Amino acid sequence: MAAASAGQQQQQHQHQHKLNIAGSAETVVSGMQHQQQHQQQHQQINMFKQQQQMLPLQQQHHQFFQQQQTKFVSRVVTSAAVHQQQQQHHHQQQQQQQHQQQQQILPAGLVNGNGSGNMMQVANLHLQQQQQQRNSQQHIFVCPTSNQQLLLQQQQQQQQQQQQQQTKQRQAQIKLPIKSAATTGVTAATVAAATAATGATHCMSTTIAARQMSQNNQLYAKNVAKANNASSNGNINRKTATSYNGNLAPGWRRLTNNNEVAYISPSGKTLRTQFQIKDYLLTQGTCKCGLPCPLRPEYLFDFNAQVPNQPLKLPTEASTATPTPCRHQRRFLESQQLQLPQQQQQQQHLQHQQQQQQAVKDVSVDVAVSVSGPAAVSDVFSTLMTSTARTATMVTPTAATSPAQAATTTTHEMANKDADCHKYGNNKLPATNRTATTPTPAPTPPPQHPNGMPTSQALALGGVPVGVHPKRPTGGHVIKQPASVLGPPCTPPLAVGGANTVIQQQQPLQQHPNFKDDPAGYLQQQTALLHNSLGVGLDATKTAAGTSTARALPQEPIVHSSQQQQQQQQQQLQQQQQLQRQKIRRLSLFGKWETDPAPATNSQPTNGTRALQVDAAAFARPQKPQVTCVTLVPPPQESPVSSSAAETLEKRPEQVGAISTSHESPRQSLSSPTDSVDSAKSTPSASPKPQTQVPMQPQLLQMRPHLQANLSAQTPVTVPAHVRVMRQQQAQIIPGQRLPVASSSAAMATMTRSIVTSTAGTSTITGRPVATTLNNSNPTVAQLQSMANAMNGAGGGGQLIMTSSGQLLVIPTPSKQTTQHHRPGQPGQGVIIQQQQPAELHPQPGGGYIVSQPSPVAAASSSSSSSTVILNSGGAKLLHHQIITSQAGQINQATSGGSGNQPQTVLLNTLPNGGYIVQQQPQTQSPQQAEQILAMPQPPPAQTLIISSPDTKRRARKRKSSVCHTPPPSGSPAKIISPQISPSIPNQAPALLHQQAAAAAAAAPQFQQQFQLSPGIQGIVVNKPNPPQQPQTQQLLLQNGQILQQVNLIGQQLLMPAGLVMGPDATLLQIQNMPATSLMTPQGPVMLRTPSPQNKPSFISPSAGGQQYLVGANGQLSPIGQIYSTPMGLVMPTGQQGGASFVQASPTTTTIQIQQQPAPQPTQISLQPAQATYMTETVMSRQGTAASPPDTTTCSPRSPERPSSHRSSGSDMVQCVSSSEPDAAVSPQSTESRQSPSSTDCERSICKNNVFTQPSGIYKHSEPKIRRIHITSQTSAENGISLMQGQESPTTTQLLSSVPTAQPTVEKTTVRTPTKRSRRPQRGAARAAPSASDKSFPLPPRSFAIGELIWGPARGHPAWPGKIVKMPDGVCTPSQQFDHVWVQWFGGGGRSTSELIPVNSLQSLSEGLEAHHKAQKDTRKSRKLNSQLERAIQEAMTELDNISASSTPAATSSSSATISAVPASAGPAVIGGQQQYQQQQQQQQQQQSPSSTNNKINGLARSKRQANTSGASMVLTTSTAATLSGLFNQQRAKPIRIAPAPPVATTGTGNIGTIAAAGAAAASTGTGTATTSARSEILKLAK
């Protein structure tokens, strides 16, 4: 027993520390920071005055804990006497604490607290004792029965359980699956009885001590309870079990109107039915404050309009709730304050945690994390424990058992870990845990959640195990408090706090290979992890629960049951957020922390971004791959969360689709309240497509057909960085429904790749459980279902309509969720990628077939954007019953995939009758562009998901090499068509051929027209298979939506407002505004063109202005430039000559042509959610041959010059230009000006994502020179983003890890670039090899040489010409302002006043001119320039001429450029040969076009610009050397370095520090000595 007690103490300490961390966060949040901080160590929830009273005892207790900790550390077996003493201390402390807890916890209410409040208190005391003894070792808090004797027994039991749990926890720590832990989850009564016996047997001394303490505690608790009504919670809980004394919880509103009752939650959510209530309660991120702890929604929420409002009287609960702000309220506090206490506690906590974490890592703490109310901490803990317990299948029927279940959760290593974190809180809130376990999140609990949650949240997304609550045996009223936890995007802060501990532990493990950096190594790692998880994780998980074995990794909160799945989803959101924040590696099922590839961090932190990234490997249960079905329950968060987060979580590819045993969850929150059977049938469960994705995926992907409840939301494993499944989780998800999408496991296996987002749009999926008949093992059917689900989820507001004919209409509601695509803001809303086996038709109930499109494009792309799929089940015109013939449909999808960048709805139907399928196309639709990340630039930054299907990523790598090589076998058009589509081609060559962008159009004849509607464009590109078909029916729609006329425009383009589709009968069909949808209509040769129907050219000439053409089925080509003339600014530089690149209408679409160059490495850009821009560049392809320059991707969501604000989602959308133009093949003016209405500008945050790789040049569409992509807001991003288009676009592909922080990416880039660079120098484009410097180091802000001309904000203008001058005499520039320079502005009228300007705000001359021109273009109302500005510019030009004349007398535009090396006194060591080389190149370029940056010099200016723009290339000048040395982080390439210094100085030295190996070769070209030492001389561009 001594040993057990020692172990318990150890665990207790660990748990307490964890809980302390969480608790500290809570306390901070709750505002009881002082008390709780004291008590945090003892109890997270010492919310009451008793806490203060107990402080001394607590301190003592804390001391004991410390002693225990020392014991734990030494693992010394403490004698029973010592343990008794400790217990006595615990007793005293616990008594006080328990009183406090009773006050605190009671509000949450003991789950089993049927007895008096005193009993509750006693139970709390016992629990506290147990917890203290365990230091939250005991996850299972046995709810004291009403009898004090039972309480004593319970104490004994708890002690025994504690010991057991300790042993179990130890086992768990040892990573031994603790099957016994599940036993601990026995119902409280049983446990109480058992513990009475076992307690005595187990450890008499502790039992006796516990009894004594319990007696004392009971007396004390009775008094306290009487005094404090602490038992009110328990009473309420008891009441709640049967009935509540009211129907209106504090903080909630109950409105009656017309005999209809609506409850309005504290967060403003309106709930009109019990289903909605339950769904809300079970959803993460929803505010459940004020609800009694054991919550029986049926009893509390009375929808009988005849019953008046009866406020619930929860004195204790109210008191608890009052002191601590709601989680939602506290999120801010938590994010800030929590981190401090948490960090402190975490440090301690981590020490213990680290010990336990190894064991605990895998435990899906997340599940249980969310707890509501003051009990939140313990609740979270218990929830975790409970969820684990549930997972363990050891779900105690009674709520009281939930603590026990929590104990069972210890079986999960992760649970242990969380348990540790939570346990600490539990010690404080033992009863609360029980209470918390009850789904009802008392308003108070949520505050605690923040406190308790942070750690667990770190482990669990937002620490909200939605599934947990449902799983909670709490009277079966499963309220998924996770919703509350997840509720606001704020959860990420919580996650951050919690994540910190986890991250700290996890991050060391982050060393795992990135998919991007080392795909082979990564895959191997993933495979190994998968196998390990299958072997080890399965044992542990199986122990927990056969099906629920899948543990929710912090990152992959795949929960065991659908509820768990919901939790997982929520957790995933939270986790993703956390990951995004902290790049926490997800915990592998085994105890090990799996490091997610850097991209994982990319996943949007926003809760909204919900990446259902399931580590397939983590969850893969070889035996039960079927279980893989994960029910994604969209949290009813205000912001639709997309998994992206990717998209958010860019974890290593989820090898397996989320595996969740859906069977456990009673209901799928996903399914909307009215799921009709048909809809259920049609609801496709996207089964990931086996495609090239990670082979292991299939294992997880296999969904058990029986797991109908869970939609298989399988994130393509391969997409590590991307959150495959963007679930728009609508708050409206109806809890009761299940969308059981059962696809045959085999089908699922095949579907592995596809991301099925079973997102339940709030009402999208009809409420009735969708029992998909997929069991027939038609993967495609599952896909259809998933599509339907995706549609449902996608249109959070979208409606899934089952027509009488049985067709599914998914109509995304633009307003509600905004069509997911349309609303990039709701990133990941509908990601239903149907990535089914190629060309499988799934019979729909209506008899229509939904062809799952093998092409990953739709699936992959859909992930990032919420895609709405409208599956036609047959008959309805809107939706034709045959959704798509497999290939044809696929082709359409592929095509849409190509255009998929914008979240588009693709209406896939080959339906003869012109049925429309609206499928919102995931932006990354074209698998070919694995890299294509659909980062919706849309404002919801957090929600932006970068989703690249794992296939895509791998495909990008493999396909780029292979796909390009293997264009669709049959279709020459396919071959011609950009390989983008081709990647899908391998799956189905014929369909893929069609898929290819042009090919799709060409293939269109088979398929009826395609409409691509991009929200910005609001046009439909209709590829008509036969122009002649129904020429009469065509109507020309203006973008304003007016119908100009019904014209028989066979060859003409019809502009249709986003929502309108023309029916074959010439009727206009308005599909709700799906701004981002692409409608593919079978008939109608309508090609949407902006103004002009066609460009005659039947052939696409890559060189033609760099335009890309869309080929209509009728053979019409419309230059993309025309088609997308709108600022949407689809940027498609010239189509690659090899194959026409398909331009995707969606502004965000990134069309990357996978040229024949098979660069193994797909570059994927992971965008932070905020960044809408993503550049997906197949850098590899660029590497291919110089002849076809790498695709240049333009990310110009915003003009770089202007602050990054999303002007409009459309314009903000990233415009990715993929051009494989020969170096200057595309005239910059045409491409840039036309293509990129907004300057290419990648947000810094994107750059931050390591994944973000800017392919080479960014096209400034409007200006030939490439606009510097400087993401105005983010300095670092600038360099990272900077793409050097240079003459050689290929060189431009730099994977600049936009943020220096993304060193790994950078380094990768470095490696890559050097080869290019080596070519480059020869080419003379000398694109400033920014990537090398970028990669090599975080680049400090750009440095400017004295005398250099710059642009900067002055005189109220964003860009004003100025000149770097020496520091004025007598002025001392503080060292901290090394990043500032003295600037003298031109046009001062003789005044030579210089200002100290931050370097970051300055732009090089060329950049400034560019920005200036752009700004004028954008803002100038009159053609007249400000005369002062004009004068200033003239002065600057004159000065420039003087400087160039003096410094480089022979400054010819020739590549030879005199480089004046200015010694940079404090030059950063970072600046290395590469940089110098780049600088030299820049100099050359600049010399070549000294002022050409202004000029629209086609090749050079642009290359210069880009090279310069790349943050990598920096010219350090003496004046700025110091600046640079400190600030490489933001380095704006100075395209033009105007250095007064004579070029002579180091010209020809050629001694260039080769800091970057890549730079070395290039460096040789550059002359000038640059030492990489601290005072490195920096090559200054003389020109």
UniProtKB/Swiss-Prot annotation:
Keywords: Coiled coil, Developmental protein. SUPFAM superfamilies: DNA-binding domain, Tudor/PWWP/MBT. Residues 1346-1408 form the PWWP domain. Residues 83-104, 430-439, 563-579, 679-693, 851-862, 1323-1333, 1474-1488 have a biased composition (Low complexity). PROSITE patterns: MBD, PWWP. Residues 658-677, 1179-1195, 1216-1240, 1287-1313 have a biased composition (Polar residues). This is Methyl-CpG-binding domain protein 5/6 homolog sba. The lineage of its organism: Eukaryota, Metazoa, Ecdysozoa, Arthropoda, Hexapoda. The gene is sba.
